[in-house]
Regions:
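Radical SAM [4Fe-4S] cluster-binding motif and immediate context
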Residues: 201-356, 361-363, 369-376
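Radical SAM enzyme core and accessory elements
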Residues: 1-69, 107, 117-120, 150, ...
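Acidic, low-complexity intrinsically disordered segments
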Residues: 2-264
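Flexible glycine/acidic-rich beta-alpha junction loops that bind and position SAM and/or redox cofactors
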Residues: 55-58, 163-165, 279, 361-369, ...
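Structural recognition of alpha->loop->beta junctions
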Residues: 166-183, 311-324, 373-388, 645, ...
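A short helix->loop->beta-strand "cap" motif at the edges of active sites that frequently abuts
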Residues: 146-152, 295, 319, 352-353, ...
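Amphipathic alpha-helical interaction surfaces in cytosolic regulatory modules
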Residues: 600-666
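Glycine-rich beta-strand-to-loop/alpha-helix junction loops that act as flexible
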Residues: 154-160, 269-274, 626-627
Length: 667
């Protein structure tokens, strides 16, 4: 923290020039419980919730349903080596952060925890669900109607691909498309321009039950123009791409916000094909190189988009991990145009870029022999993380329309829609295939996961291998940024050393793990003391992880509850004693206009409200002091002290008139 003091004259000088209160790093303020008291009645109360836990096959859900994409759909066959990270319903926090009304977000509540919140009397309850969780949505609706009967129910999420007739019995409103605009209109709040306020959402990654990394989630866009015939997210938004963060500058502002929390934090950009928008990516690269801090960004991409960049350009954009679709050799999607994927994936790996790639089973041309041939070619590319999904129809997609027209839905699924919904998880064959039975396709899927793990070993070891490739290529680079990136890779490799001891003892490819460890030791030297201690403890941690997996212990997350503007002092327009406060959100800033008489109480409450506002988004705040506003210098100094940790994001300007000008001169 940069230490500084602000005299009243310095504050007045900065106010005249409309400049931020200083520069430099800052700590993130805790969300306070006080702000500007609203005028009149408070707005309606909003509760946004996911479906309830427990989830999983043991609780009546489809095979891959749970809380984790990696463990459930990618590294599901890797046992103790599977990285663990809970994926939340991120859109709920994003919507809540961009309303004016008080809002509470619940992530994976139990029935009891949800009931406790419902008894507080929300006016609206939003429920987010996917198609595969339709039955879970019905459970939540029943609880709402019993314990908050006056609340209006809003259904949202990709489960709303179903038609109105199917959903009408369960909701008063159906949110399809972009949720912030929908909810603001529903609550009769004025439209808000993009980019919206961006909440901080951070995920923890564990290996052998030990926290290893934190990832900040960046909401950059919705929808995808590629329009693959099976893709729900593309057709849900009518093949349109909605830029939640329109420019590279907007994205980088969020990046810097996360770096304030942790300079080494990993980042994930949620955008179906982030690199397809070259203007944003090019500007991001300029800003990343200008700052010089080596970043670790994971992004969704396509062969078409990746072919437009060199691996070095990707790294200089901060991207060192991508999710790209392999799909099938003859699937023929437009997004696969560009470099042959047989060259693309090895090239990315050789430059230190990890690759999560997805292969699909069940295309019309597939037979067991063709699937095994494609699997062998796919595994030869050594993707860091492999995913294998069954080609399936989702309402609203061209594939679904074709299957229904041809009458090829499995009869038991067609006869029981809720059974069909429950099995829309990518791990159940739902279509009558010309060459294979459903059970055969599902067995081949399991074979793919098992074969990958047996031949290529744990993905966490593959990650270290890719980082090492990047380190070897760039640790003597002419580029200062890439040298710094190589240094970060080296530190991450040494931090990950404990995985080798477990991989040698319990992994399917102990010889490969031993060779990689020896090569790394020869290049980087022995690991530091901390890594050696963790290596000694790693087998015990891995054994504990195996025990919890075998006995289904500690496999469910705890409730995550976040409240937005839930106190009577939430920052909003209103009367604060004799000080009138008016808020106006501009494109990149929130304007706070104050007028009247400023005293100690109003200064403290205004500062608390500004801190709360900035804690939940990446905007700036500009305080406009109206002409004729009366304030003693000590109250302006108090405001400055209260906002010290965030001074680089706050500015104050004074609409100077005779009385105000006299005050500033005397200050």
């Amino acid at each position: 923290m940069i230490q500084y003091s602000l005299t009243s004259r310095a504050l007045a000088d900065e106010a005249r020039m409309e400049t931020p209160w200083g520069t430099g790093p800052s700590a993130v303020a805790e969300a306070p419980q006080a702000s500007v008291k609203p005028a009149g009645r408070p707005g309606p109360k909003v509760l946004l919730t996911s479906v309830c836990r427990p989830l999983g096959a043991a609780h009546g859900d489809a095979p891959s349903v749970g809380y984790e994409v990696l463990h459930g759909q990618v590294t599901r066959a890797q046992g103790i080596f599977s990285p663990r990270s809970v994926n939340y319903t991120y859109g709920l926090d994003y919507i809540a952060a961009n309303l004016d009304a008080p809002a509470v977000v619940l992530q994976y509540p139990s029935h009891r925890e949800l009931i406790r919140e419902l008894k507080k009397g929300p006016d609206y309850v939003g429920i987010s669900f996917n198609l595969v969780l339709f039955h879970r949505m019905k459970e939540v609706v029943a609880l709402v109607r019993k314990h908050a009967p006056r609340a209006q129910i809003v259904l949202g999420g990709y489960g709303t691909v179903l038609d109105d007739a199917t959903l009408a019995p369960y909701g008063d409103h159906i949110c399809r498309g972009e949720g912030v605009a929908f909810f603001r209109a529903l609550l009769d709040e004025p439209p808000r321009p993009m980019p919206y306020d961006h909440p901080l959402v951070m995920l923890n990654l564990k290996v052998f039950s030990i926290p290893m990394d934190r990832t900040g989630v960046i909401f950059a866009g919705l929808g995808c123009p590629n329009g693959c015939d099976f893709c729900c997210t593309s057709h849900y938004f009518k093949r349109r791409h909605i830029r939640l963060l329109p420019t590279g500058d907007d994205i980088f502002r969020v990046v810097e916000r996360y770096l304030e929390v942790d300079l080494r934090m990993s980042l994930a950009i949620l955008d179906e094909d982030f690199l397809l928008a070259k203007d944003r990516a090019r500007r991001m690269r300029e800003l990343v190189l200008e700052r010089g801090t080596p970043l670790s960004i994971f992004a969704f991409a396509s062969v078409k988009a990746l072919s437009r960049y060199t691996p070095q350009e990707l790294l200089e954009t901060g991207v060192d991990g991508v999710w790209v679709g392999y799909e099938g050799k003859r699937s023929g999607y437009s997004k696969q145009q560009g470099k042959p994927i047989e060259k693309l994936i090895p090239e990315l790996r050789a430059h230190g870029i990890t690759v999560l790639s997805s292969m699909m089973l069940g295309f019309e041309y597939h037979t067991p022999e063709i699937i095994r041939e494609e699997l062998a070619e796919f595994l030869a590319l050594r993707p860091t993380y492999p995913q294998f999904l069954i080609y399936g129809p989702t309402p609203g997609t061209p594939f679904y329309e074709r299957i229904m027209q041809e009458g090829r839905m499995r009869p038991e699924m067609a006869a029981d829609p809720e059974r069909y919904y429950r099995n829309c998880d990518g791990f159940t064959s739902m279509v009558v295939h010309p060459a294979m039975q459903p059970g055969e396709i599902e067995a081949l899927q399991g074979e793919c996961f098992a074969t990958d793990f047996r031949l290529n070993g744990p993905s966490i070891v593959r990650s270290v291998e890719v980082w090492f490739q990047g380190w070897k290529r760039y640790h003597h680079s002419d580029s200062p940024y890439l040298r710094a990136k190589a240094q970060r890779w080296g530190e991450e490799i040494q931090f990950a050393f404990p995985v080798f001891r477990v991989a040698r003892r319990s992994g399917p490819t102990p010889e490969a793990a031993s060779r990689l460890e020896a090569e790394i030791r020869a290049a980087l030297g022995p690991p530091p003391m901390g890594a050696r201690v963790r290596s000694f403890l790693a087998p015990a941690a891995a054994a504990w992880t195996g025990f919890t997996l075998r006995h289904n212990l500690l496999q469910h997350p705890k409730l995550v509850r976040r409240a937005y503007r839930s106190t009577r002092w939430a920052l909003r327009s209103g009367q604060l004693g004799s000080l009138r406060v008016e808020l106006e959100r501009a494109l990149h800033s929130t304007l706070v206009r104050v007028e009247g008489v400023w005293d100690r109480a109003s200064a403290k409450r205004l500062a608390a409200g500004i801190r709360a506002h900035l804690y939940h988004n990446d905007a700036d705040v500009k305080v406009l002091v109206a002409e004729g506003t009366h304030a003693a210098s000590r109250y302006l100094e108090l405001l400055a002290r209260e906002l010290k940790p965030l001074r680089h994001r706050v500015s104050i300007s004074v609409l100077t008139g005779p009385a105000t000008g006299e005050y500033l001169m005397s200050a």
